Amino acid sequence: MSIVTIIGSGMMGAAMARPASDNGHHVRLAGSPLDNFIIDALKAGKDHPTLKRSFAGVSGEFYSADELEPALKGADVVVAGISSFGVDWFADHVLPLLAPGTLVVSITKGLRLEADDSLQIFPRYFASRRPDVDFAAVGGPCICFELFDRRQTMVCYCGEKMEAVRKARSVFATSYYHIMCSDDAVGVECSAALKNAYAMGVSLAVGLAEREKGIADARGITENCIPGAPDLNPVYNPQAALFAQSCLEMRRFVELMGGNGNFVAGLPGAGDLYVTVFGGRTRRLGTLLGRGMTYSQVREALSGVTLEAAAIITRAAEFLRRAQKSGKADPKLFPLMMHMDSILNAESPAAPDWDAFGGF
């Protein structure tokens, strides 16, 4: 039995407790500074406030953000379950507390734009802060509710040390949670990060179709973006076109970063993009922008919602502009990415240039 400490008790971090507990490991679920209301509820024996599930069947304890030291003491595996906006907090406050040789499994999706104009995946950033700690990361389609409910799920674990990746798989793999392994951390992590960005792009078509029905504000956006909710205007050719363009640009981007572009056709890319478009905060973001709202209006309508897609798009587009100056990339090969950046950062209306899409 291992001690598995999960830092970040939001929905995905909390869901990871299920396979770890089912495998007989002792789980410690610890909150970030934003998670106190979750930890307070769980300590009181209540359901998880956002996952809407009981933890009665999960073996372990709950810790608040000011209880990191006892939560991490003796931990064999630590899950980085924070959002991309919490990466520096994790590096500053959690990594220094880890014993050498601890295995960190990151489920955080995103990319860092560095001062030298490079993009860095989070596991490499963490490793630069603690080279004596082992790191693995997770990519692939995994809806938190379904994992917690033991639905059949297949993902990809990656890392630059296959021994660490296989150890992570041994801790979490179950009869319902199936794990592929890869040493191409760049290919997997870039695909996993970019699918968040491009899920917004595909969702623009949802909002554009709803605009045809006269829906141009945030009415019903939460209910309409729950996975399985019917589309208000079921038009799918535009969504399919944007999905295909997303996969094309993701492959180009992953290869530009030095990863294997084939991952885009697999679990970390197209697989994860598929479920992300079905519902959740990124679908809400893209749908509202497609309805004709500006990004400023959308941020107000979705106040309190973490919009990781916006951060990834902004960083990726800026990376492409900087890479163009050095002759390493051509933003014209990423028309959907650059259009999404214009929508977010120049308040441009959602109006995809369909004739700019396509190619191989």
PLM features per residue range, with description:
Residues M1-S54, G60-S64, L72, H93, ...:
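NAD(P)+-binding Rossmann beta1-loop-alpha1 motif at the extreme N-terminus of oxidoreductases
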Residues G8, G31, S106-T108, G139, ...:
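Short beta-strand/turn micro-motifs composed of small residues
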Residues G10, A14, N36, F62-A65, ...:
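Electropositive phosphate-/nucleotide-binding environments in soluble metabolic enzymes
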Residues F62, L68-Q152, A168-S170:
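Rossmann-like NAD(P)(H) cofactor-binding subdomain of soluble oxidoreductases
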Residues L97, S128-D134, Q152-N262:
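Internal alpha-helical scaffold of NAD(P)-dependent oxidoreductase catalytic cores
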Residues S106, D134-G139, I179-D183, A265, ...:
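General beta-strand structural signal in soluble alpha/beta enzymes
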Residues K195, M200-V206, E210, D217-P234, ...:
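NAD(P)-dependent Rossmann-like dehydrogenase/reductase catalytic/cofactor-binding core
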